[in-house]
Amino acid sequence: MFRTVPKTTLLAPIQRRTLLNGNYPKAYPEHVPLTCLGRAVLAVGSGFGTFFDSRRGDLVATLGEATAQPYFIYKLREQMLKDPTGRRLLREQPRMTSKSLDLDKLRNMKVGSIGRTYVEWLDKEGVSPDTRAQVRYIDDPECAYVMQRYRESHDFYHALTGLPIIMEGELALKAFEWANTGLPMSGLGMVLTPLKFKPKQRKRYFDVYLPWALYNGFRSKPVINVYWEEVLEKDAEELRRDLGIEQPPDLRQMKKDMAKKK
């Protein structure tokens, strides 16, 4: 999710003068200031596009930004401001890329460490931290960083929980993120995407993964405040205990087991 792909014509109307806020100067180089109408059009357009093709990472990212303002992203920033590590993240604003994380170094870390668990998950799923879309539609620069940090931390959440990038795994993680961060885009996916599931997928989701996601998301500490770059050598199971996160059942194995019972 949130990965960059070629720009879509679906969002071309945003370039029209009535949707761009010409009275609002750019707050950072990539910033695209929008009018209220522009933000609404962006949310509706990306929302429909995401529902019909949830693999479109650009639309998922755009929907997240369009629905995070004017309230939810500020609440998430407040969570960071209340935490010493969160405040330091806001002050230092580190970015996570394959270069800054040094993936080759992570591959040589101790088995079971956060760094090793993370890079093994990346290799297994065939993804890279370099494909995260740049935030464009959040007006406040600090809040834009909060959204960027959330976006770049997403694969660490995957690695920590063990959830794969297949649709059921993404949706379970989105439900967890909604319960933990309050960002509405994750909640919308949690509610609407199951409508496209097959009966067995829907049963797994509602019986196992949604209850897991809500329980762990609400009870765990705010994951936005984890300084991942500084805990790479920490044992993954220890960090799960510190955060209050239980791993869900292995989704791919559960699918195999259910297929054998046919």
Swiss-Prot record:
The gene is COQ4. This is Ubiquinone biosynthesis protein COQ4, mitochondrial. Its EC number is 4.1.1.130. GO terms for biological process: ubiquinone biosynthetic process. Component of a multi-subunit COQ enzyme complex, composed of at least COQ3, COQ4, COQ5, COQ6, COQ7 and COQ9. It comes from the Eukaryota. Disulfide bonds: none annotated. Zn(2+) binds at residues 154-155, 158, 170. It is found in: Mitochondrion inner membrane. Keywords: Lyase, Membrane, Metal-binding, Mitochondrion, Mitochondrion inner membrane, Ubiquinone biosynthesis, Zinc. Belongs to the COQ4 family. This protein may be expected to contain an N-terminal transit peptide but none has been predicted. It is an enzyme of class 4 (lyase). Residues 243-262 are annotated as: Disordered. Its cofactor is Zn(2+). Pfam families: Coq4 (PF05019). It comes from Yarrowia lipolytica (strain CLIB 122 / E 150). Residues 252-262 have a biased composition (Basic and acidic residues). Lyase that catalyzes the C1-decarboxylation of 4-hydroxy-3-methoxy-5-(all-trans-polyprenyl)benzoic acid into 2-methoxy-6-(all-trans-polyprenyl)phenol during ubiquinone biosynthesis. It is a peripheral membrane protein.
